[in-house]
Regions:
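A glycine- and Lys/Arg-enriched "phosphate-lid" helix/loop adjacent to the NTP-binding pocket
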Residues: 423-458, 462-465
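Glycine-rich adenosine-cofactor-binding loop
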Residues: 91-93, 172-177, 184-185, 193-213, ...
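ATP-dependent small-molecule kinase phosphotransfer cores
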Residues: 361-412, 416-422
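Rossmann-like adenosine-cofactor binding region
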Residues: 229-295, 411-417
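Phosphate/diphosphate ligand-binding glycine-rich loop within oxidoreductases
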Residues: 87-187, 278, 284-286, 290-293, ...
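NTP-dependent small-molecule kinase module
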Residues: 322-327, 334, 350, 354, ...
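Domain-level signature for soluble enzymes in the chorismate/prephenate branch of the shikimate pathway
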Residues: 1-86
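Adenosine-phosphate binding glycine-rich loop
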Residues: 274-332, 469
Length: 487
């Protein structure tokens, strides 16, 4: 008599055989995929799949037929994916990338992230089994030694950001150059005949300098920590008209660092930071505060990915998708600021509840951490003490922002706070007539008219949109919802 254990043992043995056969099948499928790609054949062949199902179910019971169909539909789906090949982005151990989202939007579902140590890079290139991949920091230069061929453009640039496997040969290309040029045009930054300062000397800066020459830039000054022009040599680059950051300085939400002080530059017309996370970086924020046309690297990431997608043997994406991706990949978080008593906290609660979004109110956070209400903190320790705590709270929040942040009315007075506020998301100014402001528990609101006069210009400069809260609060709520739906 068979026991459950005996029967399960038989299943385990069969599973081992099935798994081994499936892996052999997968290897053959991958070979078929390469032949199809070379000859331009379609991956999906429904007639072939129907014939296989018919052959396998000819002499089975109805239950067996359904069982085989269910299993083989999964096998066919996995096989189609294998025939298409596997792709990805290769970076360092701290890699965080939007590239998988971008390539999946282009129609490549088999695109993943791979973190590779510098010492393991050539082994990865040799054994990854990928059909193609993008390369990001810190591997863009080092990977060249691991490849079989390098395109003329990539060789001249001295860096590779895209690798395609053709007949087992690993071939390196560079699409950063094209992506950078298209991003400058998209953002309206002109470099022709102008002095351009490029920060950094790595693979990205090499592609940028190559592109700048193609766009007929005037003098190009590459600034690095140990090159012929260092950051200390301000006289060599202070008169630049365009500034490009190709360093990783400033990467990460709430980082707050900048590779160079924007005040050094007296003639700046445009700033482009290849970093796209956060938006804005501190460099971009500081430039915008001076009225300079400044942008992060998200659009370049999208357009260089489109050129890589084409190198992978797939159709060049419709350019209409670029703007949609640029919008979709930008931050959806919101920060509510405004005068004390303007309704920020209540609106934050309403939005949080309606859409099940995480929310933090900085005053509530301070009260929870100190065990004292804000008025008591100010009465006992003074305004400056409260502002120091507030600044630390905002800086910490910027490291990992919730969906909604509501700020104290004076949080915008500190310049560092202003950067962190912008880095956390879309900034909404909740505006309410001073005569309608609720003034309970508000020791800082003694001279409300003077506060408003001092703060309104700052609110105006920081906000992405102004929301009027002079009518019923539901009207302001609906206006915020419309803004969120537009993002």
């Amino acid at each position: 008599m068979n026991t459950i254990d005996n029967l399960r043992s038989q299943i385990d043995s069969l599973d081992n055989e099935i798994a081994s056969l499936l892996l052999k099948r997968l290897d053959i499928v991958s070979q078929i995929g390469k032949i199809k790609a070379k000859s331009g054949m379609a991956v999906f062949d429904p007639t072939r799949e129907e014939k296989i199902i018919k052959r396998l179910t000819e002499n089975t019971t109805p239950a067996g037929e359904e069982y085989i169909k269910t299993i083989y539909n999964t096998v066919f789906s996995s096989s189609r994916n294998a025939e298409k090949g596997k792709y990805g982005v290769v970076g360092g151990e701290s890699l965080v990338s939007k590239s998988p989202d971008i390539h999946k939007a282009f129609g490549n579902e088999n695109y993943f992230s791979f973190r590779v140590k510098p010492g393991d890079l050539c082994d990865f290139v040799k054994n990854s089994g990928l059909s193609g991949y993008n390369v990001t920091m810190p591997h863009k230069v080092a990977i060249m030694e691991c490849l079989d061929e390098i395109s003329p453009e990539a060789a001249e640039i001295g860096a590779v950001n895209t690798v395609v496997v053709k007949e087992d040969k690993k071939i390196g290309y560079n699409t950063d150059c094209l992506g950078f040029i298209e991003a400058l045009k998209f953002h309206g930054i002109s470099v022709a005949g102008k002095k351009v300062c490029v920060l950094g000397s790595g693979g990205s800066s090499k592609a940028v300098c190559f592109a700048l020459k193609q766009e007929k830039a005037g003098e190009i000054v590459m600034v690095s920590r140990s090159g012929s022009v260092t950051y200390a040599d301000t006289d060599a680059y202070a008169d630049s008209q365009v500034l490009i950051n190709c360093t990783p300085v400033g990467y990460g939400v709430g980082n707050g660092e900048t590779p160079v002080c924007i005040d050094v530059f007296k003639n700046l017309e445009g700033v482009y930071d290849l970093i796209y996370h956060p938006d804005p970086t501190r460099l971009v924020f500081d430039a915008r505060q001076k009225g300079i046309n400044a942008h992060n690297g998200l659009y370049m990431l999208i357009t260089q990915a489109a050129h890589a997608h084409k190198l992978f043997g797939m159709p060049y994406p419709d350019e209409g998708i670029f703007k949609k991706l640029y919008k979709d990949l930008s931050s959806k978080r919101i920060v509510l600021m405004g005068m004390p008593g303007s309704g920020k906290t209540e609106l934050g609660r309403l939005i949080s509840t309606a859409f099940n979004l995480s929310r933090v109110d900085t005053d509530e956070m301070i009260e929870a951490e100190t065990g004292m209400p804000v008025p008591e903190i100010i009465t006992k320790h003074g305004v400056e003490y409260f502002r120091r705590i507030e600044k630390e709270v905002i800086k910490r929040l910027a490291q990992n922002p919730p969906d909604i942040v509501t700020l104290g009315g004076g949080a915008i007075l500190d310049m560092d706070n202003r950067y962190y506020i912008k880095a956390m998301g879309n900034v909404l100014w909740i505006d309410r007539d001073t005569k309608k402001l609720e003034r309970k528990r508000r020791p800082l609101s003694v001279d409300i008219e003077k506060l408003a006069k001092d703060r309104y210009p700052i609110y105006q400069s920081l906000c992405d949109v102004k929301i009027s809260n002079n009518g019923h609060i539901s009207d302001a709520f609906e206006e915020i919802v419309r803004f969120m739906q537009s993002k």
